[in-house]
Regions:
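Extracytoplasmic/periplasmic proteins that interact with beta-lactams or build/remodel peptidoglycan
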Residues: 1-28, 49-52, 57-61, 325-329, ...
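Beta-lactam-recognizing serine transpeptidase/beta-lactamase-like catalytic domain environment
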Residues: 4, 30-75, 80-306, 312, ...
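Hydrophobic face of alpha-helices
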Residues: 9, 13, 147, 234, ...
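Generic non-transmembrane alpha-helical segments
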Residues: 15-19, 84, 149, 240, ...
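Short amphipathic alpha-helical signal-transduction/dimerization elements
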Residues: 206, 245, 321-328, 332
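Amphipathic oligomerization regions
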Residues: 305, 309-326
Length: 355
């Protein structure tokens, strides 16, 4: 039997369709995974078509974008860089990183944050999405160490969900990385992923460090994951990812009443004819809930929002919030947060997030 839950599928599609219309986006996708079994519970794409009505068919509408389309993830990749830094033993969540004036000169290039933030702890680098802080950590690691965490998290390999034409993305051999490439890859540029790959990769933060195999078929029994991180690293990452959805983070709009949500925003300029387009964005959010013992992973991509807002925390996080809110209720997942949701402050611009 298929693992797709029809209630969650409809919920994901409804929220995605509304967000794509609201933000005048070119397209969008949502993936909902069972964080304990790796089962795909929902897989929605917009635009789409009804296979019973061939008159509106065109190949662009029929594509399962979440599985076959690739994008540069931007800041949704930062947790994997920070996890590699924690794994090295040289950093803890409280280690202070100097982000100076929000600029890190590297030869002819400069890594920039949108807003200068001064000294930040590792946890704050993640919460505020600092490119400079993330790049500094990445550059202190041997390239192979960063590559090992990315590769073992499933990047650069087909996820094998059981769908024809799945994309494997691009993760280059670390022997070929120049320092500037290692720096930009640390915050999700120069690497390409599918939304399914990204959703699956976040399973390492749900399972105490194991990467789950994903499937479109119901699983009769529990599956073994592949170890990627030490359990203490995975738990530390989950704690830090909760800061992202709290005031001071980039995604308070991902909050869900009664549940702790951990997650990360991404806002990446898109490549057009080999150059980054200043006004075309891939805006994303990946959320885990309840964060105390995750049951669901929801990944959202809004492609080329053009109605004014473009940060992942503005356009993708609210979709994840709505999908999680409905899905947790449908699945009767007990709340892990006693307090009612407080009024959400306006989303802060990420410190970094864009390049």
């Amino acid at each position: 039997a298929l693992s797709i839950d029809l209630k969650l599928q409809y919920l994901a599609y409804r929220e995605l369709r509304q967000a794509v219309a609201t933000h005048k986006a070119k397209a969008g996708s949502v993936v909902v995974l069972d964080a304990q079994s790796g089962e795909i519970l929902a897989l929605a794409n917009v635009p789409t078509y009804n296979p019973n009505n061939r008159s509106r068919y065109d190949p662009g509408r029929a594509r399962n974008r979440a599985l076959v389309d690739l994008f540069e993830p931007g800041s949704t990749l930062k947790p994997f860089t920070i996890a590699a830094a924690l794994e090295s033993g040289r950093y803890t969540p409280d280690t202070v990183i100097a982000t100076a004036g929000g600029a890190l000169p590297m030869g002819r290039h400069v890594i920039r944050d949108v807003h200068a933030a001064g000294d930040l702890t590792v946890a704050q680098v993640l919460q505020k999405s600092s490119n400079v802080g993330t790049a500094r950590m990445a550059l202190s690691l041997p390239p192979r160490d960063l590559w090992a965490v990315l590769s073992s998290s499933g990047f650069g390999a087909v996820p094998n969900a059981g769908f024809p034409g799945e994309a494997g993305g691009r993760l280059r051999d670390p022997k070929t990385w120049k320092p500037i490439e290692q720096a930009t890859m640390s915050y999700g540029h120069g690497i390409s992923v599918s939304l399914m790959q990204l959703a699956r990769a976040y399973s390492i933060f749900c399972t105490d460090g194991e990467l789950l195999p994903v499937t479109l078929l119901k699983r009769a029994e529990a599956v073994e994951g592949t170890p990627v991180l030490q359990p203490k690293t995975a738990r530390a990452m989950r704690d830090m990812l909760q800061l992202v959805t709290q005031p001071g983070g980039t995604a308070p709009k991902a909050q869900v009443a009664g549940y702790r949500v951990a997650g990360k925003t991404g806002t990446a300029h898109k490549l057009v004819n080999g150059a980054y387009a200043p006004d075309k964005y891939a805006s994303s959010f990946v959320g885990l809930a309840p964060a105390s013992a995750p049951r669901l992973i929801v990944a959202v991509l809004i492609d080329e929002p053009s109605a004014g807002q473009h940060y992942g925390g503005q356009v993708a996080a609210p979709v994840a919030s709505a999908v999680l809110s409905g899905a947790l209720r449908v699945l009767s997942v007990p709340p892990d947060l006693p307090v009612p949701r407080t009024p959400i402050p306006e989303v802060l611009d990420p410190v970094g997030e864009e390049v």
